């Protein structure tokens, strides 16, 4: 059976990776390792203590329309809980439809918890204001800010929650590049069409995403949510659908080199092609070196960036 590996890079974690493990893997000549790109990175992540599961079904959602149709349908089917963690919920048509649906699920007895980053909310042009949060909470939805601003504000600049996680009944999870906003479907006047991707996951990796959500939720709210109801057993996937998933979750000032090295090793070990899609392509020195050496080996390297950016600099 040919395994397909999905490596999901998230922000914020309590993981720690030994520098000597990273360096030892990175300094080995590629040919001497004798591994494919997938297995090389998988070995690196295992040595680094990253949670890896091989009993998963993964669906790639290649547009905002696909993501929100799939997510909303999964929420409609929720029986026990819905957990949402995003950098921001933009106060627009998508968020309004989402909170309306969540309020309906609360009436059915479903637990709904939502968390967003304080800076992410403040920095978007349609933030959730106090009156909006009050209405949401009155409908029985628990919603909290991650790391609200307190003086001195500069102390909170780097420690932000950029995760995009949804977990429904501990059975289905979503993660990827999209927050909650209608511009993932409609685009923006000055920018145009918005290209991003997301993933739907069923299987053991859902537990890893649930653990990430509940760790931060319990820390922020001083609650103690957990137990079997949030971590159900998952059905065994067949060989034809079984996907290996590694959840890479990091915090500022921790594991700062790990993601760069994981990307670099994937590029170094590529044999046919490397395709990169990134709107904010600012490669580190290790990524630049990996790309140059890979090109020198005759591997086709294609990089797609935005023709117009939402960042003014």
For each of these PLM feature ranges, what is it?
Residues 16-313:
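Charged, low-complexity intrinsically disordered terminal segments
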Residues 4-13:
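Sec-dependent N-terminal signal peptides
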